[in-house]
Amino acid sequence: MSSFYREYNTHMLHNLTVHEAMPGHALQLAHSNRYQASTPVRAVWWSGSFVEGWAVYAEELMVDSGYRRDVSSEAASALRMQQLKMQLRSVINSIMDIRFHAHDLDESAAMALMVERGFQEPGEAIGKWRRVQLTATQLCTYYVGYCEVRDLVGDLRRDRPQWTQRELHDAVLGAGSPPTRHLRTLLA
């Protein structure tokens, strides 16, 4: 039980709230639900890497924007460390997912990777090991999607310097939840 509370501490709960709610999944899905798709396929299907990528991007965005700085500089620094830990975890999860499905990773190596290199609590790592065995490439969507969304936002910021941050993010979220490569075309 203490492993659970070490993992889900105050800073993790703030980061998780950003990821799952605002401005993460809840905001992204609200925009997606308002989108009027031109085809039934666009209305039904969505990109997992875009959805998870947006949520991971939102974690970084909030820290960069000063979330928790109003509480104290220590709270803001602790949240930054948590956000970086989660970003490291997304990279390690991607490595683990690929290596497991390429038959190049056993349980003991996966646990060592997650616990020793990724600072995951053992209880969390056991759950992740089960998850990687039941899904294929889903754990990669967080990091791959984050990189795609981050790069898209950076390119839009460069190409449309007159846009406010809100205009930029509304444009990214306003086309539903397509794969980022298609979103680039839609925003061109």
Short names for language-model regions:
Residues 1-188:
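Long, His/Glu/Asp-enriched segments that create or flank divalent metal/ion-associated functional microenvironments
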